[in-house]
Structure formats: C-alpha cells, structure tokens
Amino acid sequence: HSFPTRRSSDLASFSLMAVTGELKYHEDERASWFSHKAEESKPHYYKTYLADYDIVAEVTPSERAAMFRFTFPENDSSYIILDAFEKGSMVKIIPEERKIIGYCRNNNGGVPENFHNYFVAVFDKDFKWKHTWSDNWKLNENSTDSEGDHVGAIIGFMTEQGEQVNVKVASSFISLEQAELNLNQEIG
C-alpha cells in the first residue's frame, strides 16, 4: 500500500509490504497474488489476502495517518518492508522505539526544491531483524539507516499462526516532528 494515496506519485509516496519466507524486498519480486473477489474496500477501510505470503493486510486511513494490521502465518521469517522510492529518500530504523522514520521526495514536478514527505511508522512488536537497502537494491544487513536516490527499510520477526502486527503510520510535508504530531493527534 502506498501512502499518501491521493495521486501519490505527485505527493512523494512510500509503501509498506508484508512478506514471509525468503526475503524478497526488490519491488519486482515482492508482489503477491490477490483476488478482487476476496478484498473488502470502503472509504475508511481496506482488506485483502496476500496469497503468496498467507498474510491478511488491512488499512484504515485518516487525513495524514493510517493504521495497518498484518495477520501473519506461523513463520520464522516474517517481514515488513518500507520502500521510500526514488528521487531521494532516507530511512532510519530505531529498534528500541519499534520505529522507522525517514523521508521521500519522489514527485512529478511542480514542487519546491526542498520538497520532502517526512514519515514515521511505529510497530507494536519488537524487531528480530533490521536491514536497509541502498541505491541499486544493495542489501545492508543489520543496518539501521540508509540515504540515497532509492532506499528502504526491512524489519523482521518470527510470527505465530494468526499473529497480528499493527503499524501506525503518519506523514508530513513540514518535518519529522510534524509527522510524529500527526500520528499522535490522528491515531494515538
């Protein structure tokens, strides 16, 4: 799911994707089959089943934030991938706070030179693994930060059958501090 969602390529979007098993973080490899017949889509709620990974993904948005819930199978290798996309991005994993912060700059023009979409993602489960990737999809194992043209963050954990991992996400075009404020004001 990309965030923000309104014409997201104009607004500097980033995405979250849950996967299991062998780590597939490259955007061309991590996609999953899903059926429109099995999805639930409303203005305030979206749910789908990611068949390739046996994960149920749900999201409910607010104006500047969203609450994600991923229901995992029993697996020793469960991951959530945050892709900050190209045109300049930064990610920083803060394990002791169960948090990823960063920014993305992807856009289709018509924005100021200093345009950034700052984001914060807060998880309700400790991270067993933490990785980032840098330009050209280079995996940086046990890394907590990356900055470049196209970077991302990967956090991982062992999950039990039906275990849910919740993620609170918010963004701001002003600052990381404002993204945190948006998260606290809109979804707590």
What residues fall within each predicted segment?
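Accessory carbohydrate-recognition regions in carbohydrate-active enzymes
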Residues: S2-G188
